[in-house]
């Protein structure tokens, strides 16, 4: 049995919705276990409350980076912060030096997904900022191939790239992930789970 981790950070719930869709896609692959965790919030509680951060999440916080070594594939989700991963996710990965030194993640699969306010708000640079970290750990990056028809959907403004699933939240965050974007996220989860199963033999 292969094990897939979906690890995310979400301020307002957009990335969390994508994370659940990715996990749903993973669950559709027989013989695969999927775990869904989030990283810790760094913003003080009072600031998060005033900013309207989503607080009703059910995913547990993953505090111990050493747990990553137990998985065959890790899919990482974070909203963009100026074209890069959010500091909460960066903080988590900055604690993985021990894993890197021991080569614990070499040969494992990795993927990424994100949200931005606008269509051109840094989706692909955020995804590649995640990819860079995964590659430094010796992981093999798996994206979303164009065998996913939703990538070329033209009937709506939609997120979704070959680098990973994405969503567009709007300037005020009011837009939630569309069905097309969720389809891409589910496809991504299924695809990386199938790849992990093949490698696990």
UniProtKB/Swiss-Prot annotation:
Record: residues binding NAD(+): 12
Record EC number: 1.6.5.2
One GO cellular component, as annotated: membrane
Keywords assigned: Flavoprotein, FMN, NAD, NADP, Nucleotide-binding, Oxidoreductase
InterPro entries linked to this entry: Flavodoxin/NO_synth (IPR008254), Flavoprotein-like_sf (IPR029039), Flavoprotein_WrbA-like (IPR010089), FMN_Rdtase-like_dom (IPR005025), NQO (IPR037513)
Domain Flavodoxin-like: 4-192
Residue stretches in coiled coil: none
Cofactor: how bound: Binds 1 FMN per monomer.
Cofactor(s) this protein requires: FMN
Binding site for FMN: 10-15, 80-82, 115-121, 136
Annotated positions binding substrate: 100
PROSITE patterns, sorted: FLAVODOXIN_LIKE
Reaction(s) catalysed by this chain's protein: a quinone + NADH + H(+) = a quinol + NAD(+); a quinone + NADPH + H(+) = a quinol + NADP(+)
Sample GO molecular function, one term: NADPH dehydrogenase (quinone) activity
HAMAP family xref list: NQOR
Family as reported in the entry's similarity comment: Belongs to the WrbA family.
Protein name as annotated: NAD(P)H dehydrogenase (quinone)
Organism per entry: Chromohalobacter salexigens (strain ATCC BAA-138 / DSM 3043 / CIP 106854 / NCIMB 13768 / 1H11)
Lineage of source species: Bacteria, Pseudomonadati, Pseudomonadota, Gammaproteobacteria, Oceanospirillales
